[in-house]
């Protein structure tokens, strides 16, 4: 949760996070399906109960600076998010392992805390993202794709009911952005960590970017708008 608070303090407009299910069916926030790289545990998230995972230190390379950082539940995040105005891009992590009821439980928490208007559901598993509409038909969803994108993304998203297209920055073109906008599709691009990419995406009229440096991007955007 510390990372989210730091992001809020940096002035960002929103947060991107990944959700998975524990062995006992609790929705938790963690990027990788396995624990080895980001925590002091080994193995897969799905092989541990929530109680077991709560003793896991997810501080990663920042442990010496920030100490013990537990893996947060999505419920804890939703409670925190209900007290601010941030947009949240929730990635359903179901491409490597399929978690039965992950979509249902995620949507129930979003509804309980009244966050629907500030949520975008995305996934590399497009069926998983779209299945969230079974529980909340007007939920905003994004087609998340790797670098290189997909052909005719604007048509694809419109055809299958996505409101957003979430491509990796590598290989994205101005023409693809224009096609998405022509079809009423928002374009939110990941992961933008250099200024040349940010400049291009701004000129192309992209709707949002996912970055590891929100404070830098916000300062740049503020200066850009000030110049007119």
Where do the PLM segments sit?
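Phosphate-group recognition and catalysis centered on beta-loop-alpha active-site segments
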Residues: 1-228
């Amino acid at each position: 949760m510390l990372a989210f608070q730091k992001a809020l303090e940096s002035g960002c407009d929103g947060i991107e996070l990944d959700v998975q299910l524990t062995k006992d069916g609790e929705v938790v926030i963690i990027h990788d399906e396995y624990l080895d790289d980001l925590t002091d545990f080994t193995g897969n998230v799905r092989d541990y109960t929530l109680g077991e995972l709560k003793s896991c230190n997810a501080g990663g390379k920042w442990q010496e600076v920030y100490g013990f950082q537990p893996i947060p539940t999505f419920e804890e995040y939703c409670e925190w998010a209900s007290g601010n105005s941030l947009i949240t891009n929730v990635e359903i992590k179901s491409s490597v392992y399929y978690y039965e009821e992950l979509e249902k439980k995620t949507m129930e928490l979003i509804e309980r805390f009244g966050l629907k208007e500030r949520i975008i559901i995305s996934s590399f598993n497009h069926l998983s993202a779209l299945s969230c509409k079974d529980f909340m038909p007007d939920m905003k969803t994004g087609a998340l794709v790797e670098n290189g994108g997909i052909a005719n993304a604007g048509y694809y998203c419109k055809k299958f009911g996505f409101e957003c297209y979430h491509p990796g920055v590598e290989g994205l073109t101005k023409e693809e952005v224009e096609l998405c906008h022509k079809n009423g599709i928002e374009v939110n691009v990941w992961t933008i960590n250099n200024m040349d990419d940010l400049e291009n995406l701004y000129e192309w009229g992209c709707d949002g970017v996912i970055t590891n440096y929100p404070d830098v991007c916000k300062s740049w955007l503020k200066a850009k708008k000030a110049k007119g």
